[in-house]
Amino acid sequence: MILISVQELQKSFGVHEVLRSVTFSLQKGEKMGLVGVNGCGKTTLMRIIAGEMQPDGGTIHRNKDLRVGYLAQLDDIPLTDTVWGALLKVFEPIRVMERRMAEIEKLLESADPETALRLSSEYQRLTESYNAQQGYAYEGEILRVLNGLGLKPEMHQRQVSTLSGGERTRLSLAKLLLQKPDIILMDEPTNHLDLEAIEWLQDYLTDYKGSLLLISHDRYFLDHVCTTMGELLGGKMIKFTGNYTEYMKKRTADFETRMKAYELQQKEIQREQAIIERYRRFNREKSIKAAESREKRLAKVERLEKPVEEQHVRFSFDARRRSGEEALEVRELSKSFEGQPVFQNLSFKLRTGDRVALIGPNGVGKSTLFRILTHQINPDHGSVRFGTNIDIGYYDQHQQNLNPQNTILDEVWNAFPKLEQTRIRSAL
């Protein structure tokens, strides 16, 4: 059963055309990954489907009474709510039944026979509806989702206003999952999730009975969750059956097939044009008519678009000068915030050329360690020693070291004032 059908969708921002002719459908139970280069219109398409943005052209047909849930960057959860209270609101219809059932139980204690019969009948109807909606299980479901997303019991009574941006995003995700819409729209849901929470979410979405439209740069997440893939390329949608790995194999084969068809058509067009040109050079009535006939036939041929191959970014990190064999030594490093230890007695060494991934659940101190290594904060105890001729490059996930008032060119140029502008532009 088709839940959403998109036909010839178009969207531009000024003179920049983002979506040119997007056509696809989403079936019941289908879990579709949406991929494409940055700026190709993935989030724009998702916002249009969610009803947050209007297209310039085309149509979207949704099944009647279709419930669509959209995980955007921000949610409308009141800041004065507690974490637990915000999620209880998802089950407000069930809680209304609970309150009415409790009220009936009290009324039955002093009701006359006629009233008792009426109240008992209402109580039975409520009980049947309550059980059908698994009203007895909703608090356990809230706990399961909160714990799965890394929002531990000690956070459940905290006000939303005290949560970090990442914690609020996880709370919004928890609310969306508990609402159980027919279609879930997710834009980068693994942001702000640690590995354990990502694995939990993978399993949850794999077992989810509804449909899913997902934007993610995490190919392993896409592999685990998705049953189809949709690629936005040149303002259009190309859809593939299978997960991300299968999509990449089919995409390569599809690109080669389309390129071969395009090249064959171009070759045939050039051959026809050469014949037309030769006929015209004869400059005879018969040959001119033959040329005009071929021109008309050629004009009716539907031209194939040249397939566009996705450009890949390639980074090269070259040291500015030769360093010593030992790059970094950390000894007995400890750090606490407001009396709460983040890590204690941390020791390790890095040698020149080592490549180390720093992993762990949220809150264990990964970013804190980086801030100590880059001299943004001081440790409580321990020492950090860098080797000879070591320069540090630091990429902050929140880009707090960028000046929002600068242009992109000026921001880089201010950091490297001696570089030529052409070299900076080439890097950008």
Model-predicted segments: where are they?
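ABC ATP-binding cassette signature C-motif
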Residues: 1-262, 311, 317-428
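C-terminal boundary and immediately downstream tail of ABC-type ATPase nucleotide-binding domains
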Residues: 251-284, 298-306
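ABC transporter TMD-NBD coupling linker
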Residues: 294-312, 355
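Heptad-repeat amphipathic alpha-helical coiled-coil interaction surface used
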Residues: 101, 108, 123, 130, ...
